Amino acid sequence: MAGVLGKRRTVHGERVPATGSALLVMNHVSHLDPCYDAVFVHSHGRVPHFLAKHSLWNVPVMGAILRGAKQIPVYRGTTDAQQSLRAAHEALANGQVVVIYPEGTITRDPDGWPMASRTGVARLALEHDGPVIPVARWGTREIYDGYHKKFRPLPRKTVETRLGEPVDLSAYREQPETIALLRDVTDLLMGEVKHLLADIRGEQAPEGFHTSANTKRDED
């Protein structure tokens, strides 16, 4: 489906490791993101395991794909949220590739920049030794804008995915885990994603992260 709806372009896809675990930290702008991100990871010889908002499992076609691929739904605000994080820890411990959208939902920033993100990504990143790779993707919202219910497959758009270098978290792993530390690591990772997104868009990234009444910063 991804190839039909839009052309794909990947920059530095070789940074996906051929073997072993990896945590791919990505921005989230459209319900189409998992489709493109799954194709991107598969095209580099790996099987992605998604941590994504559970409501995606109710989206026609998308839900069937996610269920069939045995992906990991995240139930925000319930005891099941911790179970989802545990499943992601197990996937990384077993040498798998996990894709996470730390914003927890499609960004509410009017211009599509990342929102303040949830700290579960920091826990995953700090507790495993595999590479933590920031990844930005842009173009899916131009095809399907979920908040405004706009579907514009034509003319065909280009969806670009750009990978950064693995983030060195060794200094953080030596420190006691605190809420402040988790927040710093989360903002560091999403800052890298934001800068990659700025490169794709050819624009200056805004300072900080978008927040709104619906954006909850503390969690998981």
Report the location of each language-model feature.
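Helix-to-loop junction immediately C-terminal to a conserved catalytic motif
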Residues: 1-28
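Hydrophobic/aromatic ligand-binding patch that stacks against planar heteroaromatic rings
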Residues: 40, 65, 90, 123-127
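Short, highly charged C-terminal tails/helix-capping segments
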Residues: 201-220
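Catalytic core of membrane glycerolipid acyltransferases/transacylases, capturing the structured
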Residues: 18-78
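A charged, well-structured terminal subsegment
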Residues: 86-91, 159-195, 199
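A cross-family acyltransferase "interaction/gating" segment
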Residues: 111-179, 212
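Catalytic-site beta-strand/loop segments enriched in glycine and acidic/polar residues
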Residues: 91-121
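Residue-level preference for the first positions of well-ordered beta-strands
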Residues: 21-23, 97-101, 133
